[in-house]
């Protein structure tokens, strides 16, 4: 583990990996035309000058291109990953070293991330990314979040400072929340107004994923949201591309790297038929699997049926399937009692953001069950009768734990959305009172345009009379906000 020097604060696995990381970042830049175009367009204007951005998002090669784009537009950045298994250590090392530094003299961005963090280490990293030495509030003035953990820590800190105390960690309903409470009890003792002071200058947060957006809307509904937010997840160029096409690529990549089993001919159950579920189902069917969908929503269930999938309940198919993939963003989707009914060497994995879709705690409590590591993030669980299950990434994101996540081109869409959302919130605070917003349609369309040349796409141009006929401008936007792509 490589930690800070006097010149820079960071904590990564191994700085000597930086040259490898830099090579992969250079390759990724070619595949990320959206971010590179934004760098070129805004480099002179420096719209993020004065921004102190705390990022909590998977520390991958693609994220490295995002970080260096934010810096190129004038921002200062501190970063942590949003998942204990998703960091690519060579990417983290390259960011800590920076494009002009060396492993011996790092000169990059403060980053706190390594693959295989404990939960205690994970929340320490998040705290470090939120802690800005020698600044007026000791914190950021912008947050770029994925899953909402950085935003959650700030809000819980403010809540407990206002109450004068944080709950005892022993009362927590999960191991992870116990670590959060331990951290906040410590900060209450060290600096009783740390989070309140830190939150006072935050102009807003841009949120990457469905789960984090859900948290934001909940906080807004109950009146506890402290600063405005842009819901990047529901930008069309994010949800219809990253969620679908990204998962279509990375799910089978993760399964293949983890298990090397032939997917063709097997039966796979995909839980949920939203954008993520659609991409996962398509990828498994493309490999020749027979795919079964479970759904609570009649509209999504009808879509799945019309797309040719069997739609059933888990109870009906749990003993038949070979592969189970949760994609819902909900909790308790596969319980221990369900896993006890699965066939020998069934593969169980999750591609939703958090680790509570699969009941890992319940599985561990089964009398006589034995857990064994096959390789990092691949474990067998042997039942007393000899039956074995293969569980990927301990129920966390298998596409990032067992593989490298979504490919660069699709992440260029999402991260271009994030960059433009950061510029929007930071430069126009008067336009965004505290609420949850979606990315303006003209910016959504801009992100799509930035990726067309790379694919050889030529757009047809509306004639003025055609534009007038359908009630739009020649240059767009072309669809109303309520349009469903």
Swiss-Prot record:
<feature type="binding site">
    <location>
        <position position="146"/>
    </location>
    <ligand>
        <name>substrate</name>
    </ligand>
</feature>
<comment type="function">
    <text>May play a key role in the regulation of the intracellular concentration of adenosylhomocysteine.</text>
</comment>
<keyword id="KW-0963">Cytoplasm</keyword>
<comment type="similarity">
    <text>Belongs to the adenosylhomocysteinase family.</text>
</comment>
<feature type="binding site">
    <location>
        <begin position="209"/>
        <end position="211"/>
    </location>
    <ligand>
        <name>NAD(+)</name>
    </ligand>
</feature>
<dbReference type="InterPro" id="IPR042172">
    <property type="entry name" value="Adenosylhomocyst_ase-like_sf"/>
</dbReference>
<feature type="binding site">
    <location>
        <position position="238"/>
    </location>
    <ligand>
        <name>substrate</name>
    </ligand>
</feature>
<keyword id="KW-0520">NAD</keyword>
<feature type="binding site">
    <location>
        <position position="208"/>
    </location>
    <ligand>
        <name>substrate</name>
    </ligand>
</feature>
<keyword id="KW-0554">One-carbon metabolism</keyword>
<dbReference type="GO" id="GO:0006730">
    <property type="term" value="P:one-carbon metabolic process"/>
</dbReference>
<dbReference type="GO" id="GO:0004013">
    <property type="term" value="F:adenosylhomocysteinase activity"/>
</dbReference>
<feature type="binding site">
    <location>
        <position position="243"/>
    </location>
    <ligand>
        <name>NAD(+)</name>
    </ligand>
</feature>
<dbReference type="GO" id="GO:0005829">
    <property type="term" value="C:cytosol"/>
</dbReference>
<dbReference type="InterPro" id="IPR036291">
    <property type="entry name" value="NAD(P)-bd_dom_sf"/>
</dbReference>
<dbReference type="Pfam" id="PF05221">
    <property type="entry name" value="AdoHcyase"/>
</dbReference>
<protein>
    <recommendedName>
        <fullName>Adenosylhomocysteinase</fullName>
        <ecNumber>3.13.2.1</ecNumber>
    </recommendedName>
</protein>
<dbReference type="Pfam" id="PF00670">
    <property type="entry name" value="AdoHcyase_NAD"/>
</dbReference>
<feature type="binding site">
    <location>
        <position position="399"/>
    </location>
    <ligand>
        <name>NAD(+)</name>
    </ligand>
</feature>
<feature type="binding site">
    <location>
        <begin position="272"/>
        <end position="277"/>
    </location>
    <ligand>
        <name>NAD(+)</name>
    </ligand>
</feature>
<comment type="pathway">
    <text>Amino-acid biosynthesis; L-homocysteine biosynthesis; L-homocysteine from S-adenosyl-L-homocysteine: step 1/1.</text>
</comment>
<dbReference type="InterPro" id="IPR020082">
    <property type="entry name" value="S-Ado-L-homoCys_hydrolase_CS"/>
</dbReference>
<dbReference type="GO" id="GO:0033353">
    <property type="term" value="P:S-adenosylmethionine cycle"/>
</dbReference>
<dbReference type="InterPro" id="IPR000043">
    <property type="entry name" value="Adenosylhomocysteinase-like"/>
</dbReference>
<keyword id="KW-0378">Hydrolase</keyword>
<dbReference type="InterPro" id="IPR015878">
    <property type="entry name" value="Ado_hCys_hydrolase_NAD-bd"/>
</dbReference>
<feature type="binding site">
    <location>
        <begin position="351"/>
        <end position="353"/>
    </location>
    <ligand>
        <name>NAD(+)</name>
    </ligand>
</feature>
<feature type="binding site">
    <location>
        <position position="295"/>
    </location>
    <ligand>
        <name>NAD(+)</name>
    </ligand>
</feature>
<feature type="binding site">
    <location>
        <position position="242"/>
    </location>
    <ligand>
        <name>substrate</name>
    </ligand>
</feature>
<dbReference type="GO" id="GO:0071269">
    <property type="term" value="P:L-homocysteine biosynthetic process"/>
</dbReference>
<feature type="binding site">
    <location>
        <position position="330"/>
    </location>
    <ligand>
        <name>NAD(+)</name>
    </ligand>
</feature>
<feature type="binding site">
    <location>
        <position position="60"/>
    </location>
    <ligand>
        <name>substrate</name>
    </ligand>
</feature>
């Amino acid at each position: 583990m490589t930690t800070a020097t006097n010149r820079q604060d960071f904590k990564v696995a191994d700085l000597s990996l930086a040259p490898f990381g830099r090579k992969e970042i250079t390759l990724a830049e070619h595949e990320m035309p959206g971010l590179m175009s934004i760098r070129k367009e805004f480099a002179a204007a420096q719209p993020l000058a004065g921004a102190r951005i705390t990022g909590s998002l998977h520390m991958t090669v693609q994220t490295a291109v995002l970080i260096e784009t934010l810096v190129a537009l004038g921002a200062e950045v501190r970063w942590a990953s949003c998942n204990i298994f998703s960091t690519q250590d060579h990417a983290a090392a390259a960011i800590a070293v920076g494009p002009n530094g060396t492993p011996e003299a790092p000169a990059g961005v403060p980053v706190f991330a390594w693959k295989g963090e404990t939960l205690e280490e994970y929340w320490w990293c998040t705290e470090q990314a939120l802690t800005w030495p020698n600044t007026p509030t000791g914190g950021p003035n912008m947050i770029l979040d994925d899953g909402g953990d950085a935003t959650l820590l700030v809000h819980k800190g403010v809540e407990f400072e206002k109450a004068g105390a944080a709950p005892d960690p022993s009362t927590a309903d999960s191991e992870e929340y116990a670590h959060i409470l331990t951290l906040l009890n410590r900060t209450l003792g060290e600096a009783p107004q740390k989070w309140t002071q830190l939150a006072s200058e935050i102009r807003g947060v841009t949120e990457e994923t469905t789960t984090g957006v859900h948290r934001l809307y909940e906080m807004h509904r109950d009146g506890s949201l402290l600063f405005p937010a842009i819901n990047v997840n529901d930008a069309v160029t994010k949800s219809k591309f990253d969620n679908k096409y990204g998962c279509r690529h990375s799910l089978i990549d993760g399964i293949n790297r983890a298990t090397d089993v032939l997917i063709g001919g097997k039966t796979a159950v995909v839980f949920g038929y939203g954008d993520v579920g659609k991409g996962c189902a398509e990828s498994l069917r493309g490999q020749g699997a027979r795919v079964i969908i479970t759904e609570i929503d009649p509209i999504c269930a009808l879509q799945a049926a019309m797309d040719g999938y069997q739609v059933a309940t888990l109870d009906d198919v749990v003993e038949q399937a070979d592969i189970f993939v949760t994609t819902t963003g909900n909790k308790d989707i596969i319980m221990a009692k369900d896993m006890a009914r699965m066939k020998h060497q069934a593969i169980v994995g999750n591609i939703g953001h958090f680790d509570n879709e699969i009941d890992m705690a319940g599985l561990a409590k089964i009398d006589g069950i034995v857990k064994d590591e096959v390789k990092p993030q691949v474990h067998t669980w042997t039942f007393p009768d000899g039956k074995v299950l293969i569980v990927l990434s301990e129920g966390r994101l298998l596409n990032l734990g067992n593989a490298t996540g979504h490919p660069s081109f699709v992440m260029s869409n999402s991260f271009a959305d994030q960059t433009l959302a950061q510029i929007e919130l930071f430069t126009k605070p008067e336009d965004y009172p505290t609420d949850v917003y979606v990315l303006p349609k003209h910016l959504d369309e801009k992100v799509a345009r930035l990726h067309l040349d790379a694919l050889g796409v030529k757009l047809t141009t509306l004639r003025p009379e055609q534009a007038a006929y359908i009630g739009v401008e020649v240059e767009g936007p072309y669809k109303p906000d309520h349009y469903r792509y």
